[in-house]
């Protein structure tokens, strides 16, 4: 009997690991343009701020597609659906690696965005479902760890490959790694019938939960502020701080490493006082952005800011996702789809705001504007915390 239990635990952990790897590759490809922005812009003879709008387009496709695509796929067995999504993901990366102009690259990114739309709508609930008993919160933390490792390994390695070969090779390698993950998924995941996915009728029910709606708005606000700055952090470090390309790569690595710390802190502290934990994470993100330009030439201070920023944004993202699942246990996939859509509205809006700031004020101002948006989000958090104190 003990062997059976140990075997169950082993396979359950391996399945969680597969989802963590999947999160790693999806987050790597979503944000790797941030690390390659200057190279892509140079190859197409475009400005970084213009190429950065590719991040906006990707995010808005995800935000618009998450809920309708999730509803269309609500009754599809989840393992089959995941394998289809990875096939689309891989084919789109092949096109990215072959992109002969910016528009072909943009089209390939839209294919990836469609896969992303459904993947993040169903993954949080699935990883909790396949996790060992009494390890549900830790499983969500491991999923977030995969996302953090994308920042630690995915983005710096993507940048290194782009520097040694070219940015197209980075997308080709991502497609190759995704193929290996797809094979692991096919081998390890069990049959996963759709459960508690919700339907179109779930949407108005969720809309009547004011705290849930308040959290979705909070997500849009705080992520808009974050990506106003983060979308252009690579050119900021190179051009404003005037640090070397190697230091820039190392700073991206530190940002991702900080995400692991954020995941660990979530697992240890979130359950003790979720409201204070969310507020503290937001303050870390806001202060890091507001002070970015002030200490732009002090290398060790910028490293510290990047680290605290990474800790804050990872802690915040997992916490808000957990809160959404807690408030909508009857329609987890629909709630997650709206969360993913809201998050990507924030990404797209932030990248757009950052582009406008660069054109109107200059690259050096992105931290001030991003931090100001974060302050508005902090006031909104305070408002909903007081209004729904007992929820």
Residue ranges: model-predicted function:
Residues 104, 133-135, 142-189, 232, ...:
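Helix-loop-helix hairpin linking two adjacent transmembrane segments in secondary transporters
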Residues 45, 77, 98-104, 115, ...:
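Helix-breaking motifs and short loop linkers at transmembrane-helix boundaries and internal kinks
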Residues 64-103:
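Conserved MFS/SLC helix-loop-helix module at the cytosolic interface between two early adjacent transmembrane helices
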Residues 108-146:
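Cytoplasmic helix-loop-helix junction between adjacent transmembrane helices
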Residues 276-320:
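C-terminal transmembrane helical hairpin of 12-TM major facilitator-type secondary transporters
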Residues 15-51, 66-69, 229-234:
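Extracytoplasmic
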Residues 92-95, 103-111, 300-308:
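Paired small-residue
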